[in-house]
Amino acid sequence: MPLSRSFRETVLARAQKDPEFRAEMISEATSAFLDGDIDTGKSLLRDYLNATNATSRIARSLKKDDKSLRRMLGPKGNPTLKNFIELLHACQHEEQIRFEVRAVHQ
């Protein structure tokens, strides 16, 4: 379902002001990937990059072209595990955060 423009603008505005919100966007994207929801994970990372205007910086750090990074996270994009891990690392570096993974029993 496409987001309404006002909701998207609200999310992007909050991401620009709130470092914890940006970190949570990356965390939620990671969780989506780990849960097998690749499309949601890509969408969240794309929203993060758009909200922070970090696409060029992160693309440079990955030694990739901006367009290549955008395609990777686009609806038909299919990032390799290596590309995904490098992208997560670059996003963490951008926000000066580090994730830890813990097993949770269900």
Q: Which sequence ranges carry the predicted segments?
A:
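N-terminal flexible/basic segments that precede or flank functional cores
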Residues: 1-44
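Short, charged recognition helix plus adjacent turn
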Residues: 5, 9, 71, 97-106
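Short alpha-helical DNA-recognition segment
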Residues: 50-70
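Residue-level detection of the helix-turn-helix DNA-binding "recognition helix"
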Residues: 74
